[in-house]
């Protein structure tokens, strides 16, 4: 029994902000903080998020006490059913938040170690495009992780419920710009993210883009020295197989580095533009072989799909594999109430195609860094801040902001709220 009781205590010491932020940063175990005023700027619109948050802004003075949070509707499960995700209200301010409660008693030692790594980076990272943990603490034998509620959900939620054939290019540019800013910071801190995908891109009510999935981050710092490559294979990697780079999947002595995240950005770009991830529904072994043999996904539009396929009968369309040479049965969306049109009868800019091609280079050394990609011509179309433009570009989608009737003692208004929340893949947010 003492072995089980020690698990919450084992996590508790990692939750201490002083232990993680001050102690470990002083020991220089996690690389150097990127200098705020010496970093190269991109264009004016993209330079807004270079400066990190202040610690006060990140934590938002949320108290680490269970009694300060009124747990409302359960909106998800996860982490092998050991995690319950609640919509909650922070009592001192009335703000609605998301609370992850993880049963530490039932966690294996491997899971506890996994959670420790997540808490490490959540306390260490401090950037406007990385989802902040508002509070982390132990309540009884549960680990509570409090984050802001993301009213637009994840980018995957958006393409699954509203943009089934993909988003428009400008919206994707805003989203990927936020992702690359976060990755640039993460890479300078000496980490590889290893789980960049649409479900780990969260969008707040005011249109701000956040990268989550910190649980999969891997440090490239060993014994105070930054390693050229790492060899660790991601845990639970079957869920992120379509996004993983060939060099990660090879698991050979050459290893991989931060450029593996750039490949994942390219796959995510295809996911957002095509409405589904490349290699979707492929068996794992086939996906592995396709990647190792050099198969490169692409954006699906008039420049990559033969003209005869764009005009063929509505019963055929591009396959769920996300590769332009595969066909399967599908029903294209009707156009203007007339005859159905091909969903990919559109044309993305040459800059967008080139951006994706650069990200998906088979040789990782040929891929640009995150900081280089932020200066790519693809982002020249951005003229405003994401918080100003993205909500307009996501119309007719409206953020979930009406929480009336969601209190646990008042069931009259819960049904509509839960119906909306169930459309969000909260399990995949991973915060």
Curated annotation (Swiss-Prot):
One of its GO terms (biological process) is protein export from nucleus. Residues 310-347 are annotated as: Disordered. GO terms for molecular function: ATP binding; protein kinase activator activity; protein kinase activity; protein serine/threonine kinase activator activity. Residues 312-339 have a biased composition (Polar residues). Residues 69-379 form the Protein kinase domain. GO terms for cellular component: cytoplasm; nucleus; serine/threonine protein kinase complex. CDD domains: PK_STRAD_alpha. The modification Phosphoserine is found at residues 2, 46. PANTHER family: SERINE/THREONINE-PROTEIN KINASE FRAY2, STE20-RELATED KINASE ADAPTER PROTEIN ALPHA. Pseudokinase which, in complex with CAB39/MO25 (CAB39/MO25alpha or CAB39L/MO25beta), binds to and activates STK11/LKB1. Adopts a closed conformation typical of active protein kinases and binds STK11/LKB1 as a pseudosubstrate, promoting conformational change of STK11/LKB1 in an active conformation. Belongs to the protein kinase superfamily. STE Ser/Thr protein kinase family. STE20 subfamily. The protein kinase domain is predicted to be catalytically inactive. This is STE20-related kinase adapter protein alpha. It comes from Pongo abelii. The lineage of its organism: Eukaryota, Metazoa, Chordata, Craniata, Vertebrata. The gene is STRADA.
């Amino acid at each position: 029994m003492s072995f089980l009781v020690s698990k919450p205590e084992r996590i508790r010491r990692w939750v201490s902000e002083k232990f993680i932020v001050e102690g470990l940063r002083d020991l220089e175990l996690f690389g150097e903080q990127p200098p705020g005023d010496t970093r190269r700027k991109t264009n004016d619109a993209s330079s807004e998020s270079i400066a990190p948050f202040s610690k006060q802004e990140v934590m938002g003075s949320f108290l680490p006490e269970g009694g300060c949070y009124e747990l409302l509707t359960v909106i998800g499960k996860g982490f092998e059913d050991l995690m319950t995700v609640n919509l909650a209200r922070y009592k001192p301010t009335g703000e609605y938040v998301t609370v992850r409660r993880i049963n530490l008693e039932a966690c294996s030692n491997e899971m506890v170690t996994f959670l420790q790594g997540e808490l490490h980076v959540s306390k260490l990272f401090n950037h406007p495009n990385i989802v902040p943990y508002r509070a982390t603490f132990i309540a009884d034998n549960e680990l509570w992780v409090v984050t802001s509620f993301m009213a637009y959900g994840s980018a995957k939620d958006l393409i699954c419920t509203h943009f089934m054939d993909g988003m428009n290019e400008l919206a994707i540019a805003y989203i990927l710009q936020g992702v690359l800013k976060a990755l640039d910071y993460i890479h300078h801190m000496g980490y590889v993210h290893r789980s960049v995908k649409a479900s780990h891109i969260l969008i707040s009510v005011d249109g701000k883009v956040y990268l989550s999935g910190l649980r999969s981050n891997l440090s490239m710092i060993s014994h105070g020295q930054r390693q050229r490559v790492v060899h660790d294979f991601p845990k639970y990697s079957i869920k992120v197989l379509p996004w993983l780079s060939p060099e990660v999947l090879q698991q050979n002595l050459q290893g991989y580095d931060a450029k593996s995240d750039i490949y994942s950005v390219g796959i995510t770009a295809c996911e957002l533009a095509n409405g589904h991830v490349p290699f979707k529904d492929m068996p794992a072994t086939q996906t592995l072989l396709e990647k190792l043999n050099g198969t490169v996904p692409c954006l699906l539009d008039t420049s990559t799909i033969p003209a005869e396929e764009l005009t063929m009968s509505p019963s055929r369309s591009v396959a769920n594999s996300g590769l332009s040479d595969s066909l399967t049965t599908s029903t294209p969306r009707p156009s203007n109430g007339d005859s159905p049109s091909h969903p990919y009868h559109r044309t993305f800019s040459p800059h967008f195609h080139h951006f994706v091609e650069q990200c998906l280079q088979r040789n990782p050394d040929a891929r640009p860094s995150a900081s280089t990609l932020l200066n790519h011509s693809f982002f020249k179309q951005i003229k405003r801040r994401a918080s100003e433009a993205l909500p307009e570009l996501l119309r007719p989608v409206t953020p979930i902001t009406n929480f009336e009737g969601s209190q646990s003692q008042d069931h009259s208004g819960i049904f509509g709220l839960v119906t909306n929340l169930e459309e969000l893949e909260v399990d995949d947010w991973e915060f």
